[in-house]
Design a protein with these regions (language model features):
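Bacterial Sec-dependent N-terminal signal peptides
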Residues: 1-24
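N-terminal mature-domain "stem" immediately C-terminal to a signal peptide or N-terminal signal-anchor/transmembrane
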Residues: 19-97, 255
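Active-site scaffold of zinc-dependent metalloenzymes
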Residues: 83-142
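Short consensus segments that form the blades of beta-propeller domains
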Residues: 139-140, 238, 306
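Membrane-interface helix-loop-helix junctions at boundaries between adjacent transmembrane segments
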Residues: 139-147, 170
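Active-site recognition of the HExxH zinc-binding catalytic motif
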Residues: 149-162
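Post-HExxH zinc-binding segment in Zn-dependent metallohydrolases
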Residues: 162-234, 241, 245-271, 275, ...
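Active-site-proximal alpha-helical
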Residues: 241-268, 282-344
Length: 346
């Protein structure tokens, strides 16, 4: 008997079996990589980010299925699920049916208001579409590497919401006015936009300024400009937007700050061995080599993004430059904001 054809057939069968396993292995490796990134963020950028008390479950959506990492008991009672991987403290389940029919997810979601039987009532869940589904909605996302930075941004919102004082403040005082309202003011009111763009430039100038006296003058000019805009808005519209702007600026600015921290981390990070084997969309952080913030204007310019993302991001960077501690205070006291902490010192 000729053994060569049999060996070739066996090799092909093993290869086919590996191909069948690969899609699910890729999912597991991606989820595990995200959890390892949380550890990196805690070590390098935001202490307590990976603390178990602030963890939120992750729901990963393909086009036809859902996987959930570390779900709550309520989730498992709501959705029939099978444990498909256990790795240390991480348990990944596959739901029998897709959790919902939405074609795209990249958000931390929860249900607020009157009590409901919903699985995520007062219980935030990070929900993300797979890389393959994400690029259908956001074509500019070029790799699994970039996709994971978006997930960590949203995961940080879960971290914020897991602080009960912050959750209570957000639900009782803020959620009634959604971020889209502030965005509309920026887009529809030229004077409002002009002032915000100028405020943001003052923050950028203060970050870049080396002279401490001039830095203080720039910060005071920022306060004067902001105070005038808010007063003018209240006079014209009979509505104070101060607390909403401060809250969303802190919420989104710090999430962007954490996302940005990964760009710097990826510049020197070694490729993940598991993803190299299972995920052809993993590009070994190639985009982030020799990373330069100035090229990503959408991170820090108000006219390139939702404005309070940029002002919040820049305010966090200014606090870093000034050596003012803020990370241990935010979210533990529900209403305290980046602006409040900067005002205490300047």
């Amino acid at each position: 008997m000729n053994k060569a054809p049999l060996l070739l057939l066996l090799f092909c069968l093993l290869g086919c079996q590996k191909d069948k396993q690969r899609p699910e292995q890729k999912i597991f490796d991606r989820i595990l990589f995200v959890y390892h990134l949380k550890e990196s963020v805690e070590a390098n950028t935001w202490t307590t980010f990976d603390d178990p008390q602030y963890d939120v479950p992750l729901i990963y959506f393909t086009d036809s299925s859902s996987y959930v990492a570390n779900p709550t008991e309520k989730f498992l009672k709501t959705f029939k699920s099978e444990l498909v991987l256990e790795d240390g403290t991480i348990k990944i389940y596959k739901t029998q049916k897709r959790v919902d029919d939405s074609p795209f997810h990249m958000e931390t979601g929860m249900t607020l208001g009157d009590p409901t039987p919903e699985f995520n009532y007062h219980s935030p869940f990070m929900m993300c579409s797979s890389f393959e589904e994400t690029v259908k909605t956001i074509p500019d996302v070029g790799s699994t590497d970039e996709w994971t930075t978006m997930i960590i941004h949203e995961y940080f919102h879960g971290f914020q919401y897991k602080h009960k004082p912050y959750m209570d403040y957000y639900e009782n005082e803020i959620v009634q006015v959604q971020p889209d309202s502030l965005t509309t003011f920026y887009k529809k009111l030229p004077w409002f936009k002009q002032s915000i763009d100028a405020e943001n430039q003052l923050l950028l100038d203060a970050i870049a300024e080396k002279d401490s006296i001039q830095t203080k003058r720039l910060i005071q000019a920022f306060w004067d400009k902001r105070k005038q805009r808010r007063w003018q808005f209240q006079q014209k519209h009979k509505f104070s937007l101060d607390k909403f702007e401060k809250c969303y600026e802190t919420m989104e600015g710090t999430a962007r700050y954490v996302e940005f921290s990964l760009y710097k981390d990826f510049a020197n990070r070694k490729p993940d061995e598991s993803l190299l084997k299972s995920d052809s969309s993993f590009k070994s952080f190639a985009k982030f080599k020799n990373y330069n913030l100035q090229k990503d204007k959408w991170l820090y310019l108000t006219d390139k993004t939702t404005y309070f993302y940029a002002t919040g991001f820049n305010m966090a960077r200014l606090l870093d430059k000034l050596g003012i501690e803020y990370k241990s205070r935010l979210f533990k006291d529900g209403k305290i904001s980046l602006e409040d902490i900067l005002r205490e010192k300047y």
